[in-house]
From Swiss-Prot:
Stretches that traverse the bilayer: none
Enzyme class per UniProt: hydrolase
GO molecular function: beta-lactamase activity
Alphabetized NCBIfam families for the sequence: bla_Bcer_III (NF041270), bla_class_A (NF033103), classA_firm (NF012167)
Active site annotation, chain numbering: 95 (acyl-ester intermediate), 191 (proton acceptor)
Protein name per its UniProtKB record: Beta-lactamase 3
Lineage of producing organism: Bacteria, Bacillati, Bacillota, Bacilli, Bacillales
């Protein structure tokens, strides 16, 4: 007993007690910190679920209003936040594939090679030829065909580009080499626009087509000079004013490619530049139950507004 009393009254005890107390305080502090961290994590997860439910409800409400099915994928490259709704479901890609085919053309050819003149006859004209029908006698360069395909959705221009690539299967092979294992290309215009429910030819998913568009326009698949060409053509697209462009605030830049087909298919894929911010990648695909259904461009514009509201992207 004498030894213990001596120990607790000597300098050793005076040194040990503060250390023990500090250790206990540290453990308690860590425990509280971990508990707080876990609580914050659970709160964030709960808020995220609530936000997703609210967003999905808004998209479902649009689907009911327009009697359509929506497929959406968006990526805000400044925050890496995504918006996904039926993002892995297949939809007919229709003419949105024209931007990807031009991207593939740029990948396979030098800038100088785009000056090659391609000749064709009236028998080669497809169902929609606002530019190519004017140049049957002279032909058009690959660069001119790319411009016509992306900016005017000229179907003959698209077919000639596909032939230059080696056909739809060769185009698909290029996409596979880029890592797109989803997008299926099997036919030329105008047949590629006719896709029945359950068929997978000439289809993609909102997520896959958005990722591939991102690779061509913002990634390293193409050197900067070629990326700039594709983006410039898409920014000057003449067919998209009532779709994604109509859903973004004034002053925002949009580079897009539209598409339409059977079953009321209406699509738009785009890169969006809010002022002084990094771009947003967005794909909106849609269709209806009936083969002869008509589409409504406002559906795409309204869906765009919900996406931007979800991403909380402002005009500031």
């Amino acid at each position: 007993m004498f030894v213990l009393n001596k120990f607790f009254t000597n300098s050793h005890y005076k040194k040990i007690v503060p250390v023990v107390l500090l250790s206990c305080a540290t453990l308690i502090g860590c425990s509280n910190s971990n508990t707080q961290s876990e609580s914050n994590k659970q709160t964030n997860q709960t808020n995220q679920v609530k936000q997703e439910n609210k967003r999905n409800h808004a998209f479902a409400k649009l689907e009911k209003e327009y009697n359509a099915k929506l497929g959406i994928y968006a990526l805000d490259t400044s925050t890496n936040q995504t918006v996904a709704y039926h993002a892995d479901d297949r939809f007919a890609f229709a003419s949105t594939s024209k931007s990807l085919a031009v991207g593939a053309l740029l990948r396979q050819n030098s800038i100088e090679a785009l000056d090659e003149r391609i000749t064709y006859t009236r028998k080669d004209l497809s169902n929609y030829n606002p530019i190519t029908e004017k140049h049957v006698d002279t032909g058009m360069t690959l660069k001119e065909l790319a411009d016509a395909s992306v900016r005017y959705s000229d179907s003959t221009a698209h077919n000639l580009i596909l032939k230059k690539l080696g056909g739809p299967s060769a185009f698909e092979k290029i996409l596979r080499e880029m890592g797109d294992t989803v997008t299926n290309s099997e036919r030329f215009e105008p047949e590629l626009n006719e896709v029945n429910p359950g068929e997978t030819h000439d289809t993609s998913t909102p997520k896959a087509i958005a990722k591939t568009l991102q690779s061509f326009t913002l990634g390293t698949v193409l050197p900067s000079e070629k990326r700039e060409l594709l983006v410039d053509w898409m920014k000057r697209n003449t067919t998209g004013d009532k779709l994604i462009r109509a859903g973004v605030p004034k002053g925002w830049e949009v580079a897009d490619k539209t598409g339409a087909g059977s079953y009321g298919t209406r699509n738009d894929i785009a890169i969006i530049w809010p002022p002084n911010k990094k771009p947003i990648v967005l794909s909106i695909l849609s269709n209806h139950d009936k083969e002869d259904a008509e589409y409504d461009d406002t559906l795409i514009a309204d869906a765009t507004k919900i996406v931007l509201e979800t991403l909380k992207v402002t005009n500031k």
